[in-house]
Curated annotation (Swiss-Prot):
It comes from Dinoroseobacter shibae (strain DSM 16493 / NCIMB 14021 / DFL 12). GO terms for molecular function: DNA binding. InterPro entries: SfsA, SfsA_C, SfsA_N. Belongs to the SfsA family. Pfam families: SfsA, SfsA_N. This is Sugar fermentation stimulation protein homolog. Gene3D superfamilies: 2.40.50.580, 3.40.1350.60.
Length: 244
């Protein structure tokens, strides 16, 4: 997934509600307001003074001139904060058969109705193979070592998706929860039960039913975000308690 226009560097002033942020452009010193496409907690990714990357908006119908896309991390690493990006990245990867566990599927449909008033992110079908329901989750929390963690706050919706996928398995289909780590300084994934114990319980129940838990990293630069390598999932690993 490539960004539509070249990104510009800025310094974050503040993120003052779920969808708005202020930043100072590095090149001009102008303070601008930018759309923050992330309703989550964004732990460690919204500190004043952090170097961020904004995408200029050339659509006159939009109210804000910039959209916040990336946070620059230590040692040259990057984190993507746009929660719409994972579905785009995974959609491109599925179409290119780049996800090993799903490479046998030739037909991919997005936003297909299923379950109870839900839409699955992707439905993969192929003659002779079970229909596969794929949900995608954005991951960008890191608190210790090289562990990515999910979720970064309570997600009732996320637990519902796990239950819906479990029901698909019980109905004879295949179901996959795919966690996409949108930061380049993590090499493995674990749950964060201290932040949402209900989600951890839903994860265990879904996995016991047969829902497959996959995780992939990403390659991130100021040009875009693409699929990286498969990462191990270790839900039993102990997350740190109440650290920012």
């Amino acid at each position: 997934m490539r960004f539509q226009t070249p990104l510009v560097p800025a310094r974050l002033v503040r993120r003052y509600n779920r969808f708005l942020s202020d930043a100072v452009l590095e090149d001009t010193g102008e303070e601008v307001r930018a759309h923050c496409p992330n309703p989550g907690a964004m732990l460690g990714l919204k500190d004043a003074g952090q170097r961020i990357w904004l995408e200029p908006n050339d659509d006159p119908k939009k109210k804000l001139r910039y959209g916040w896309r990336l946070v620059e991390l230590a040692d040259g690493h990057m984190a993507g904060i746009d929660t719409s990006v994972p579905n785009k990245v995974v959609g491109e990867a599925l179409a290119a058969r780049a996800i090993t566990e799903l490479a046998a599927y030739g037909t991919i449909r997005a936003e297909v109705k299923y379950g109870t008033n839900s839409r699955v992110d992707f439905l993969a079908t192929e003659p002779g193979l079970p229909d596969t329901y794929v949900e995608v989750k954005n991951v960008h929390l890191r608190r210790a070592e090289d562990w990515a963690e999910f979720p970064d706050s309570v997600t009732t919706r996320g637990a519902k998706h796990l239950a819906e996928l479990a029901r698909m398995v019980e109905a004879g289909h295949r179901a996959v929860m795919l966690y996409l780590v949108q930061r380049t300084d993590c090499t493995r994934l674990r749950l964060a039960p201290d932040l949402d114990p209900s989600y951890a319980r839903a994860f265990d129940a879904a996995r016991a039913t047969g829902v497959e838990m996959l995780c992939y990293g990403t390659l991130i630069d100021t040009g875009g975000v693409t699929l990286g390598r498969a990462l191990p999932v270790d839900p039993a690993a102990q997350a740190p308690q109440n650290e920012d």
